[in-house]
């Protein structure tokens, strides 16, 4: 577990991340939501005090317990399932920042809930996410999140609680006297790589590993982003491609937990941008149901690469925040099925209308599910000039940060 000094450092890093995640600086009396699991209660207290000292307005929200969540999905009728409490839209429409603290007591309690019910609930909440996305695009909102160790997470990762905790401490630089300075250094180094990537005029990327043969088309007016403060930790660099140009095979060698369901060995075959063949060693019925949630659920919303020189994460953590930032021996490549990120648009995201997003191939969905491959791989950029450049190999980008 984390001691008081480490929690204090975590809070400092989260506030650094929140500041970086905002396009505009916070003003006095801006509203910041802190949403947390019960196990993250102490960190939420530390954050509230710091936010008050900054002259901001903290709003605390405790996540439902595993029992509450299970009862909700088992007992709710259709009307209850999609119910949005009065005041919720008003709160979201006025938020200037949000910090999410994850420390789940269970990650499998929804395993027996029909996937169609989970999908219905997820779609009903998309309207709230759309409010925050719009505010984010306008520079009125920023968010960050983190995870704390729990017995449940450690158990499903196959690690002791101490080993699990140490992975978090090292990944977030909480063992450093000045973790914010370390994050700032990584932030600046990542900027150099993003600048190099965004200087290339790319027709498509070709990803090759033992089990991957995938073509990804970045599309027009795209840029690589990442290490923006949104996730602590975050080492990935990514873009939201033109989903229509995706073809070939992607394989996730890393397992995944989603809505209480365990999925392993996912193999996706893409044709004309859509996953037309979906296979999994475990959880195949669940992933097939999730990928039929809406029209965009079986299409790619994100293409991501993590440089092992940045990330200290070397173990499976049974949590997407850490698993999508896996460093290990070979770094990782992952795709997210579902929603895309408008901030990977090269222009002003606030000018992106729904019609313009569709025209440029930005995918839209209530789903966003990251699937991770940690195999040794090569990623080649095929340039519009017909030249080819290997941009990523052996777990790192082909340029020094």
How would you label these PLM feature ranges?
Residues 109, 332-334, 362-368:
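Histidine-centered active-site/metal-ligand motif
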Residues 39-40, 104-106, 150, 212, ...:
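Short, glycine-/Ser/Thr-/acidic-enriched flexible segments
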Residues 1-247, 389, 399-401:
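Active-site bordering "gate/hinge" segments
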Residues 243-244, 259-261, 269, 294-298, ...:
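A structural signal for short secondary-structure junctions
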């Amino acid at each position: 577990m984390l001691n008081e000094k480490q929690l204090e450092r975590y809070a400092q890093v989260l506030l650094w991340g929140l500041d970086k995640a905002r396009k505009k600086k916070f003003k006095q009396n801006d509203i910041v939501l802190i949403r947390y699991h019960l196990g993250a209660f102490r960190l939420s207290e530390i954050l509230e005090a710091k936010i008050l000292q900054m002259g901001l307005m903290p709003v605390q929200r405790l996540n439902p317990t595993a029992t509450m969540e299970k009862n909700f999905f088992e007992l709710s009728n259709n009307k209850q399932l999609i119910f949005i409490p009065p005041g919720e839209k008003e709160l979201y429409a006025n938020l200037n920042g949000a910090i999410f603290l994850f420390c789940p007591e269970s990650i499998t309690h929804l395993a027996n809930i029909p996937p169609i019910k989970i999908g219905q609930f997820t779609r009903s909440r998309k309207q709230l996410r759309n409010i925050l996305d719009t505010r984010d695009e306008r520079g009125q909102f920023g968010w960050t999140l983190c995870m704390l160790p729990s017995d449940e997470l450690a158990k499903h990762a196959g690690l002791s609680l101490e080993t699990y905790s140490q992975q978090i401490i090292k990944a977030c630089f909480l063992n450093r006297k000045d973790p914010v300075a370390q994050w700032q250094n990584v932030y600046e180094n990542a900027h150099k790589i993003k600048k190099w990537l965004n200087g290339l005029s790319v027709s498509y990327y070709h990803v090759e590993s033992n089990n991957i043969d995938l073509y990804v088309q970045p599309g027009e007016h795209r840029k690589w982003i990442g290490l923006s403060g949104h996730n602590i930790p975050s080492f990935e660099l990514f873009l939201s491609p033109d989903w229509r140009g995706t073809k070939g095979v992607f394989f996730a060698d890393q397992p995944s937990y989603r809505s209480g369901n365990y999925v392993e060995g996912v193999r996706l075959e893409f044709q004309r941008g859509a996953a037309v063949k979906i296979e999994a060693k475990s959880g195949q019925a669940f992933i097939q149901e999730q990928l039929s949630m809406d029209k965009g659920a079986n299409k790619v919303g994100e293409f991501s690469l993590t440089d092992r020189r940045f990330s200290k994460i070397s173990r499976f953590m049974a949590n997407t925040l850490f698993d999508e930032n896996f460093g290990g021996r070979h770094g990782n490549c992952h795709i997210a099925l579902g929603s895309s990120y408008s901030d990977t648009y090269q222009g002003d995201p606030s000018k992106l209308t729904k019609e313009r997003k569709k025209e440029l191939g930005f995918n839209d969905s209530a789903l966003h599910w990251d699937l991770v491959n940690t195999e040794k791989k090569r990623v080649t950029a095929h340039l519009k000039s017909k030249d080819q450049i290997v941009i990523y190999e052996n777990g790192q980008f082909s340029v020094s940060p």
